A protein has these predicted regions:
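Structural marker of alpha-solenoid helical repeat scaffolds
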Residues: 81, 115, 146-149
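Residue-level recognition of tetratricopeptide repeat
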Residues: 85, 119, 151-154
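Terminal, low-structured helical/coil segments at or just beyond the last alpha-helical repeat
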Residues: 32-43, 54, 138-164
Length: 164
């Protein structure tokens, strides 16, 4: 009788545990797929950009653009809180450039360079924008800024310039 009672309690605990696990899994599955689980819009945006770059490298440009647009929305939020952050301005420029909004992108890049003229990412991406908009002289100026950095940004911009 005592053994039956213990067995019954063990079965109840087992069922409770299984039920709890199932409900937990369902609630995670039902959460939105925004890719955002933090209250840090800059980090969220960086994650969207990273995922977008992976998709773009696989030729999935439309899906990548959707992620870049999500990143842009998060970056606007981050920029309201910290409008003098050159990294945020760089990512704003990047997402707009990827969307083909070159004038807007250039404005953000230039704002970032006012704050940090030697920002490697901004100099590279602004150079790429200049190549895309047929302003090779300005692209080469950005490359000259990166010349002594011994960084990937220099190599990547040099490659873009040489291929055009």
């Amino acid at each position: 009788m005592v053994a039956d009672h213990q067995l019954l309690n063990m079965i109840k605990k087992f069922i409770f545990t299984i039920t709890f696990c199932l409900f937990t899994q369902v609630s995670f599955a039902a959460s939105d797929d925004s890719g955002s689980d933090s209250s840090n819009p800059q980090k969220d945006a960086q994650n969207f950009v990273k995922r977008g770059k992976k998709l773009e490298s696989k030729g999935k440009n439309e899906k990548a653009l959707k992620l870049y647009n999500k990143a842009y929305e998060k970056l606007l939020e981050a920029n309201k809180a910290d409008s003098r952050n050159p990294d945020i301005l760089n990512y704003l420029g990047f997402t707009l450039r990827k969307a083909g909004k070159y004038e807007q992108a250039e404005k953000y890049y230039l704002q970032g360079l006012e704050i940090k003229p030697d920002h490697n990412g901004i100099n590279e991406y602004l150079g790429e924008l200049y190549v895309k908009t047929q302003r090779m002289d300005l692209a080469k100026e950005r490359l000259a800024v990166l010349k002594d950095c011994n960084c990937e940004e220099y190599k990547e911009l040099a490659e873009v310039i040489n291929n055009n």
